[in-house]
Each structure stands twice: as C-alpha cells, then as structure tokens.
Curated annotation (Swiss-Prot):
It comes from the Bacteria. Its EC number is 2.4.99.28. The keyword Cell division applies. It is found in: Cell inner membrane. It comes from Francisella salina. This is Probable peptidoglycan glycosyltransferase FtsW. It is an enzyme of class 2 (transferase). Keywords: Cell cycle, Cell division, Cell inner membrane, Cell membrane, Cell shape, Cell wall biogenesis/degradation, Glycosyltransferase, Membrane, Peptidoglycan synthesis, Transferase, Transmembrane, Transmembrane helix. GO terms for cellular component: cell division site; plasma membrane.
Length: 402
C-alpha cells in the first residue's frame, strides 16, 4: 500500500522512476500527525462532555464532530501529498487574491457569520469555515512565491521590506476588521521570519519591530475589550472574578494536575469552571489530567515537527528549491509560534488570545487546514528526496528498497 502511494506521488511510470518511488516518505511526520489527532480527539472528548451535555443534551456532540473532521483532515492530508508543489509556485499570485476575496467576503452581512460580535466564519453545509485559518496557509504560499521570485533583490529596501510589508498590511487590516488580532500576529510573525531567512538586512527589523509594537499598543488602547484582557493578564488574581477569571481557572488546572496529573477524564476545571476548555484552553485541561510531565512530552512532539520542517527547508535550499524552502520555513514558524502562544496564554506568560493548539483543540477549520499543510510539508520532503536521488543517488538519501 505504501509502495503504491509512493508510486502515485512520483507521477512516473518508467522503471527508473519506479525505483526512485521506493524512497521512503517521511513516515515520522505521518505518525506524529495521527498521534496528535487521536490524542486531541481523546482530550476534546474529555474536556467537552459536560458542556456538550448541557448545550446539546448529548455528551459526545463535540467528540463526534471532532472525530468526523479528523477523518476528513486525513483525506486532505493525502490530497496534499498528490499535488506537486510547483503548482503552488506557478500560481502563487492567485492565492493572494483568493485570500483577499475570502477575507472581504466574511465581512459582508449575509455571507459571514457573526458570533459574539466577531465576524470570522463563512457557514457551509457541514462546517463554519474560519477564514483566518485559511488565510494563514494562503499567506505562506503567497509570500514563499514572492520571496523566491525576488530572492536576489531581497537586500533592497523596496523588494525586501516595503512591498511585502505593504501587502502584509492589507491582510492585517482585513483581519483586524473581523476582528482577529491573534491571527494577524501569527501571520505577521510567519512573514517576518520568512523575510529574515531570505537574507534581509538585520537593521530593518529594529524599525519593523518598533513600528509593530507601536501599532499593537495603539490597538490595545483604542479597543476596550483588548485593554480588558491586558488588565486581566497583568493582575489576574486581583480580578479573579472579572477580567482575570479565565486565566485564574487555567492556572488552577495546572496546580491541580501537578507533575503527573489527576488522571485522564478526572479533571475538574472543565466542569463549567474554565471557559473554552475544549478549544483555546485545552492545554490547561491536558496539564490537569496528565500533568506537567505529559504536557512537556507533548511540547517535545511539537518541537520535533518544527525542527523537521526546518530540516526539510534546509535540504530544499541546498537543492536550490527556494520556493519549497520558504514554504517549509513558513510552516515551521506557523506551528511553532502558535503552539508557543497557546501554551503561553494558558500559563499566564502571554495575554489571553484565541488561538488553538494545532491538531488538538476542537475546531474543524483548524484541523482541516493544518493537516493539509502537513501534507504539503511531506510532499516537499518527498520531492527533495527524488531530486537529490536524481542528482546523485548516493547523496544523503541512500535508502532504496531492492
């Protein structure tokens, strides 16, 4: 079965290419993804049963939906494996316009769905698509193409800073109109990271970081609900029943779990004490039920994905596949930063912000997009191996099954 999948991925029928198709695809990422999907489904089930019973009179409502989306996500992962990355590279400009269209569409009354004053979803038949999740992937696809095409000019101010930051600003404005400050920060960090590894001049980043801090401060000052979150973050225990309530309850979960946890399913905070226990604050539930040791193991799994993505990017650079290199770097920055923010929010290191824990938190859009993204990453690695074997069969990848 695996051999047939490899053969299908190669898109070749000659005897020589069939031999090359036997090169191992990165099974480690596949196993890690499946492991996180299963673990996430178990934790969502544990964290959501009480809330689901109260909201829908069915304790497995969120669990069933999460399992359903996980199955679809696996098919999307396989679909991404079948698409050559050159297709993204050739049409990267089109992905920018697609991103603008969906970001504008969600703001149109009757098209976008408003929940608690935020208009972030486009309802489809079986799922509400959170367009910010799609925008993260589309932004990485687009900026990878832009940087790869202008790589010799990236040391120039116009091509290296002015143009990409202007385009990023357009995306940020549309995201902030939803409003979705968290996704704006994630995309900005990914793009800035990609610009940095492209060889941009370091001194420009001081100006960029300063400008972004000033803008972030202004956004907090002019927005009462953001100021409310900052107050709760700085003084959570003084506002334990107000703006700091969610953070205090999350920290109580960490305290209850200790090093080894209270046991799977035995958490207390998910029982109406901790809001959004199955989504943004599922990390606290994990810490309460399997302990800090279990959470550290989970963090190591995420670090494996991040460093594996960086290694894939490095190999793509060595093979002069610059688009694929920046694509892989962007994916590594995305996953790494989002995990960092989610855990930071749950532990009180960062202000409360609605970002999911990749592949674990409840949410169809996040699950589907992330699995498709990992499929792209594995595809990049597979193409790297085929090209390396074509250049020199003894070059790095020697594992060919006889």
């Amino acid at each position: 079965m695996l051999y047939r999948l490899k053969l299908l991925l190669s898109g070749q029928n000659t005897k020589k290419e069939r031999v090359r198709a036997k090169l191992e695809i990165d099974i480690s990422i596949v196993f890690v993804m499946l492991g996180l999907l299963i673990f996430g489904w178990v934790m969502v089930t544990s964290a959501s049963m009480v809330v689901a019973l109260d909201d829908y009179n069915n304790p497995y409502f969120y669990s069933i939906r999460q399992g359903f989306f996980a199955v679809i996500a696996i098919f999307l992962f396989l679909l991404a494996l079948l698409v050559p990355t050159k297709n993204y590279e050739k049409n990267y400009n089109a992905f920018f316009f697609i991103m603008l269209i969906v970001l504008v569409a969600v703001l149109v009354p009757g098209v976008g769905k408003s929940v608690n004053g935020a208009r972030r979803w486009i309802p489809l038949i079986i799922i509400n698509i959170q367009v910010a999740e799609l925008a993260k992937l589309l932004a990485i696809i687009f900026f990878s193409g832009y940087i790869a095409e202008n790589l010799p000019k990236m040391t120039n101010f116009k091509e290296g800073i002015l143009t990409p930051i202007t385009l990023l600003g357009c995306i940020a404005v549309l995201l902030l109109m939803q409003p979705d400050f968290g996704s704006t920060v994630v995309i900005s960090i990914c793009v800035m990271g990609m610009l940095f590894v492209s060889g941009n001049k370091v001194r420009w980043y001081g100006l960029l970081i300063g400008a972004m801090l000033i803008m972030a401060t202004m956004l907090v000052i002019i927005s009462p609900y953001r100021m409310h979150r900052i107050t709760g973050f700085l003084h959570p225990w003084e506002n334990a029943n107000g703006s700091g309530y969610q953070l205090v309850q999350a920290l109580i979960g960490f305290g209850r779990g200790g090093w080894f946890g209270d046991g799977l399913g035995n958490g207390v905070q998910k029982q109406f004490f901790l809001p959004e226990a199955h989504t943004d604050f599922i990390t606290s539930v994990i810490a309460e039920e399997i302990g800090v040791i279990g959470l550290m193991i989970l963090l190591m799994v995420y670090l494996f994905i991040v460093f594996r993505a960086m290694n894939i990017a490095k190999m793509a650079f060595e093979l002069k596949r610059y688009y694929q290199a920046f694509l892989s770097y962007g994916i590594s920055f995305w996953i790494g930063f989002q995990v960092f923010v989610n855990i930071g929010v749950n532990t009180g290191l960062l202000p409360t912000k609605g970002l999911t824990l990749p592949l674990i938190s409840y949410g169809g859009s996040s699950l589907l997009i992330m699995c498709f993204t990992l499929g792209i990453l594995v595809r990049v690695d597979f193409e790297n191996k085929l090209l390396a074997d074509t250049i020199n069969p003894k070059y790095i990848y020697k594992k060919v099954r006889k």
